[in-house]
Regions:
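Membrane-embedded alpha-helical bundles of multi-pass transporters/translocases
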Residues: 1-193
Length: 193
């Protein structure tokens, strides 16, 4: 989720432009949509963590706590959105979604810590740091790629989707190779038995 988050935040404009930048979907529409996508990007790691942390409760046959936290997230989301929609506009919706989801993650961590159900060892921390490093490397290459192919990704270019696909494929490969070299990704774990 970390590389996905960085990718959305860095390349949101190019992604929306490549997918929807045709016909009646104007450059202004692209800018507005890409801004929303960028703010959703901040919440991507939280969305993934919510899924993982809720399973820790489900595995103990506790479905009430995740339900309560889900309600809490929805209420916070609605509260923030309604409070600031008039002053900020539609962009508050992805912002509120990301903020409320991160607050939900914090609640999960507090409850798991309180119940002594959260165990984070040194190996896990090392792997997280390695993933962060690989994601930063990927993001750097992505920034470079978007800069080099800036003209090819222009709104008027009919083949912009192909160029974006090439860039995304390349940076994804860089990320996977980095994870493999750092020992996070092990091929033996994916061998078909």
């Amino acid at each position: 989720s970390i590389p996905a988050s960085l990718g959305l935040r860095i390349g949101s404009n190019e992604i929306v432009n490549a997918l929807f930048g045709y016909g009646s979907f104007s450059e202004e529409n692209i800018l507005m949509t890409s801004e929303a996508l960028k703010f959703f990007g901040y919440g991507v790691p939280a969305f993934a963590l919510i899924k993982i942390l809720s399973n820790l409760f489900f595995s103990r046959s506790n479905t009430i706590t995740p339900f309560k936290i889900s309600v809490f997230i929805v209420l916070i989301n609605i509260l923030i959105s309604l409070s600031l929609f008039k002053s900020i506009g539609f962009i508050i919706i992805p912002i509120a979604t990301s903020i409320s989801t991160w607050l939900g993650v914090i609640v999960y961590f507090i409850l798991l810590k309180k119940n002594k159900s959260l165990f984070i060892n040194k190996i896990l921390l090392k792997n997280i740091l390695k993933i962060v490093f690989s994601a930063i490397l990927m993001a750097s290459v992505l920034l470079l790629g978007l800069d080099v192919f800036q003209e090819d990704l222009d709104y008027a270019n009919k083949f912009k989707s192909i160029y974006l696909l090439f860039i995304v494929s390349f940076v994804a490969t860089i990320y996977l190779i980095s994870c493999y070299l750092l020992g996070v990704l092990k091929i033996k774990n994916y061998k078909i038995k």
